[in-house]
Amino acid sequence: LDDELTISAPAVNGGPADDYDNRADPPSWFGRYRDPAMTPLEFKALEWLDGFYELEHLLATRQWAMKLRPQASPELCLAALVHDAERYFPGGPTNTPSRFDDPSYLFAHSIRSAEFVDSFLAEIPGVHDEFRYQVRCLVLRHEVGGGTEADVLQAADSLSFLETLPWLTVEWVQTGRYPVEMAMAKHHYMLTRMRPAEAMEYGLPLYEQAISQLKNAAAVPLDGRRQVASDFRLLLGLRGTDDV
């Protein structure tokens, strides 16, 4: 990646997000994902996906990747931040697969995401072909792993799902998209597919909390939760909560 990359991003300060909860009041979420190490290209990627309901999940995936692999490459950090990009754009594979481990769905989702990400990077001045290739490879493998950083990305995706998306599986149950047993199965799948041993240690408490919520899904308040999850400026602490 060239030093002359001409994308500006505001400086942010802070550390990892605090414990996950369902509160949707903006002040409690302000700046949870601040990171002074975020690059201009990463910030540009967030702008590209502005309003995507998975932005919190993507930010948390990047955090988990860096926690699992402190020497994470720039390619891994960016891939973590864009791995589900295709869901932002209409026309993708169904978001209601009958099985969460269905390779046909997982590969279609991963390939489509990689294509969108590669096209995005192709338009950015200063991004080298090798960087694009490595990011594409990681996005292609984010559901199945394969190689050290791909395994880290898969585990980071799982940990982030368990941490930040229980509200989504509760929403599935509340809206009738999936029965509670299927929602629980999604969390179980995300937990058990992880390879790094330390990821399982981090994941078990998150899994137990998510299952506990699903057992009482009808009573879980979700007002405003999707909006918070879609607002990267709020999550990075880049603007006041009065603007929400």
Feature annotation, model-predicted:
Residues 2-8:
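Extreme N-terminal basic, low-complexity initiation segments
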Residues 7, 14-15, 19-32, 47-73, ...:
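Divalent metal-dependent phosphate-bond-processing catalytic cores, especially two-metal-ion Mg2+/Mn2+ enzymes
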Residues 27, 31-62, 88-106:
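Active-site flanking loop/helix segments enriched in acidic
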Residues 61-64, 108-123:
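An active-site-proximal "capping" alpha-helix that borders the catalytic cofactor pocket
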Residues 69, 74, 105-109:
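Secondary-structure capping and boundary motifs in well-ordered enzyme cores
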Residues 74-98, 113, 117, 133-144, ...:
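His-Asp-centered metal-binding catalytic motifs of divalent-metal-dependent phosphohydrolases/nucleases
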Residues 123-129, 173:
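Inter-helical turn/loop segments and adjacent helix faces that build the functional surface
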Residues 128-132, 146-147:
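Short, structured loop/turn "capping" segments at alpha-beta junctions
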